[in-house]
């Protein structure tokens, strides 16, 4: 029986993408199938970063193709192509930045900044081009967490070059003021400074810009949510009732301005004693998971109250780079992958494909 495209595609459909739960044929990720006698070749284009998984995908797809009678040699080329996805209506995308993801919390002290930096590093580790904007004007922490000192350079006196470490571009007000200097600014001034940090930084072709939002739902957060083209937001909370109450306010804020929630991270979900291994739910159990179910959001996962996460962030080497194959780093990487896959499934942004239309009165 002659080897046919239909037979091959049927075999390739048996291989599921574990990130989407769908096969590569149905999602149209598999392209350019070529049959030349017993030689078969095809491309797979992933819409999300998955560098650590590509070898496994290739092996499974080649095995599926070779299970078909008449197939001798298989060439599978797997690449990643991350594109811009739609943001809030009426807000133009930033040049050089494809997707902006806000990491937010209703209150401080729930581990939002630590989550933001590790998500950024996890996306970069999987092959994405990533930037990190420290939007917490009053309490910038990303310079310390990313182990970066010094001030940004400016080549034209008007824009700034982003700082960089661990393959991630970073900008923060913390680079522009002394470490112990308090930012005693009113809301409009802080908001203006933040917009300048965002728009006057020469970001270099980013797939994702992670924005470490200020805690709460005040003027700065609302203005940012309305003016910054956000692909989506990740909510960070602890299981504690008071934290969940404030997290709900953050969710409502994003809903009102049309920013979709990509998922919820439950931080400090459990404490495991380092001496005896006793498990204790200091802040309550499964509060974040229950809230995600209540609001129909994706539950991205839970992180324990872990001293190593804190020590690594304080030392300027966050968990994902300090212990990349450790249990905590793998949790962050799984969360980042879920976020990226959720973004890849969103509507694409085609605004750059259409010419702008200007209407003027005849003179």
Give, region by region, the residue ranges found by the protein language model.
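Short, non-transmembrane amphipathic alpha-helical segments
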Residues: 5-8, 29, 36-41, 45-75
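Phosphate-binding loop that captures ATP/GTP phosphates
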Residues: 123-185, 191-199
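Conserved catalytic-core segment of NTP-binding enzymes
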Residues: 207-208, 214-315
